Swiss-Prot record:
Gene Ontology molecular function: rRNA binding; structural constituent of ribosome
Function of the protein: Binds the 23S rRNA.
Ranges annotated as biased composition (Basic and acidic residues): 76-86
Listed name of the protein: Large ribosomal subunit protein bL31
Amino acid sequence: MPKSEIHPKWYPDAKVICNGEVVMTTGSTQPELHVDVWSGNHPFFTGTQKILDTEGRVDRFMKKYGMGSANSATSKEQKADKDSQK
């Protein structure tokens, strides 16, 4: 005999919400789906160029581990001072 009540509840009119407004309805196991990007505001579909992440992975790594451009410029100056003292 098969088990009853093992499947999640199905919502045939689930709302997809992007930036606080309902952009479409679809079927889902959740009543509301919150998304950051959808086809209506994605640069590929709209034909516009938009920078979503202003700080790249390398910049975040440099900032996190203290290897930013300010630190590297200071270390170069210190190295030049040491070389001039020799």
